[in-house]
């Protein structure tokens, strides 16, 4: 018996030794061994996951680029590239760098959506079905809805300033963006602007969005939660059911509206396209609900974050603020989005905000095609995950001088080709954000109305507000650390 036990122990030791030696061999001789990066990245991705969970991944990866150059190994099987030519190659239309495994964990077992699908044929087909509703031409038809909500938002800000002595622009921009995309997606506003508080749908959305971070960082927890009732997952499941129910009610309401008044009377862009697709048998009702819900996720916090950092950055610099105020003051009383679009300085302020404070600053992971690819003079084998993050692309000092410390709209007076190639606040290629045109319209109209109404705003110090409140927590989306942005007007 003792002999058997000793032999078993020796076998285990030998097996462990073989595994360790195999790992060491692969680390130092594998196809990624020659790539620059910290030594720890060759062995484990835990350091990267730690920074991801702490909301710090883009800053961590940017520091690695500053140390190791434009291509860096950030985990055993993942690289990050900060090079405009490589990014253009990866994200161009018809690129064979398809979305990576990261996206497969977003919906877990839910049907795939336009955003979460990794299949290019599925994505192309679904985008053809849904893209028309969010095209620039279609969004123009909804300008009155967007403009009305922007005006209501600024009116509510003015009332808060009288009552509170300052404005929390982050709160109001969140209400604006969510109410707007809610009406365009479901045909009915959440009425957060009128009530001055978050709706149940918005609170549910926050919980489900946080769960998405956990799923993509620790996908095994989703599988565990199927058998073990983890409290947070249980709460998120209840929130998901409420959101699903709201979407179902909205779609049924839309269908009844069509039956009574015809499709031409319906105002909901996403619901109109999705219901038309359902009538053709292209999408199930469950798929329509998921796509409409995806519009809410993509179209709420993103625009609000951009507007918040735009106002904060402008108010910190009196020269920029005064130039912007002077330009929007030239608009006619009943100005339109086209009028704002024609303002060069306003456009530069918006672009500089999207450069320095993109709402989605982190990785856009893609899988290298099976035959491999050469990126930044390095051959990368097929199947490796390669990411590009706009946080780094937008901070390349060779392309954007003094990129971190200087909020400079004038850098966009005559942008270089490299600046245009590196500028990707809405993604790139066939995967460019479907809501880009709506986001741009919201940014233009909200910026113009805010700085026409408030002509000398400054960053507040009331209620203990400091720049530390605006420190960015970077998950998939950015959020200010203090979840507020106080402005004196």
From Swiss-Prot:
Induction: Expression is positively regulated by the azaterrilone A cluster-specific transcription factor tazR. Pfam families: p450 (PF00067). Its EC number is 1.-.-.-. Keywords: Heme, Iron, Metal-binding, Monooxygenase, Oxidoreductase. It is an enzyme of class 1 (oxidoreductase). Heme binds at residue 433. InterPro entries: Cyt_P450, Cyt_P450_CS, Cyt_P450_E_grp-I, Cyt_P450_sf, Cytochrome_P450_monoxygenase. One of its GO terms (molecular function) is oxidoreductase activity, acting on paired donors, with incorporation or reduction of molecular oxygen. Its cofactor is heme. Transmembrane segments: none annotated. Pathway: Secondary metabolite biosynthesis. Belongs to the cytochrome P450 family. Cytochrome P450 monooxygenase; part of the gene cluster that mediates the biosynthesis of azaterrilone A and other azaphilones, a class of fungal metabolites characterized by a highly oxygenated pyrano-quinone bicyclic core and exhibiting a broad range of bioactivities. The first step of the pathway begins with the non-reducing polyketide synthase tazA that assembles one acetyl-CoA starter unit, five malonyl-CoA units, and catalyzes a series of Claisen condensations, methylation, PT-mediated cyclization, and finally releases the first hexaketide precursor through the R-domain. This is Cytochrome P450 monooxygenase tazI.
């Amino acid at each position: 018996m003792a002999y058997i036990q000793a032999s078993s122990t020796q076998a285990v030791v030998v097996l462990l030794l073989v595994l360790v030696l195999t790992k060491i061999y692969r680390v130092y001789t594998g196809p990624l061994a020659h790539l620059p990066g910290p030594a720890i990245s060759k062995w484990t991705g835990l350091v990267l996951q730690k920074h991801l969970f702490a909301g710090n991944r883009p800053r961590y990866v940017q520091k690695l680029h500053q140390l190791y150059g434009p291509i860096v190994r950030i985990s055993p099987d993942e690289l990050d590239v900060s090079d405009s030519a490589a990014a253009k190659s990866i994200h161009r239309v018809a690129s064979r760098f398809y979305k990576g495994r990261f996206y497969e964990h977003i919906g877990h077992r839910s049907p795939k959506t336009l955003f979460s699908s990794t299949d290019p044929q599925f994505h192309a087909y679904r985008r053809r079905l849904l893209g028309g509703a969010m095209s620039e031409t279609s969004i123009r038809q909804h300008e009155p809805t967007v403009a009305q909500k922007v005006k209501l938002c600024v009116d509510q800000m003015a009332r808060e300033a009288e009552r509170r002595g300052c404005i929390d622009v982050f709160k109001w921009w969140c209400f604006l963006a969510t109410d707007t995309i809610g009406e365009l997606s479901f045909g009915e506003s959440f009425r957060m602007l009128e009530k001055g508080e978050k709706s149940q749908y918005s609170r549910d959305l926050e919980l489900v969005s946080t769960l998405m971070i956990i799923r993509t960082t620790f996908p095994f927890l989703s599988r565990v939660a199927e058998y073990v009732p983890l409290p947070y997952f249980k709460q998120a499941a209840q929130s998901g059911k409420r959101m699903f129910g709201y979407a179902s009610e909205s779609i049924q309401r839309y269908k009844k509206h069509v039956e009574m008044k015809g499709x031409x009377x319906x105002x909901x862009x996403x619901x109109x396209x999705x219901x038309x697709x359902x009538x053709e048998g292209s999408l199930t009702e469950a798929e329509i609900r998921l796509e409409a819900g995806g519009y809410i996720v993509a179209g709420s916090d993103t625009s609000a974050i951009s507007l918040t950092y735009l106002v904060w950055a402008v108010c910190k610099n009196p020269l920029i603020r005064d130039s912007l105020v002077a330009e929007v003051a030239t608009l006619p009383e009943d100005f339109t989005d086209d009028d704002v679009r024609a303002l060069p300085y306003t456009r530069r302020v918006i672009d500089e905000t999207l450069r320095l404070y993109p709402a989605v600053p982190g990785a856009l992971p893609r899988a290298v095609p099976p035959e491999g690819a050469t990126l930044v003079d390095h051959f990368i084998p097929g199947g490796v995950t390669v990411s590009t993050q706009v946080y780094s692309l937008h901070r390349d000092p060779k392309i954007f001088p003094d990129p971190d410390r200087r909020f400079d709209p004038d850098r966009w007076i005559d942008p270089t080709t490299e600046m245009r190639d590196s500028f990707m606040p809405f993604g790139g290629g066939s995967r460019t954000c479907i809501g880009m045109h709506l986001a741009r319209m919201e940014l233009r109209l909200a910026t113009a109305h805010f700085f026409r109404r408030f002509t000398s705003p400054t960053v507040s110090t009331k209620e203990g507000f400091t720049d530390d409140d605006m420190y960015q927590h970077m998950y998939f989306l950015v959020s200010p650390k203090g979840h507020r942005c106080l402005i004196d007007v």
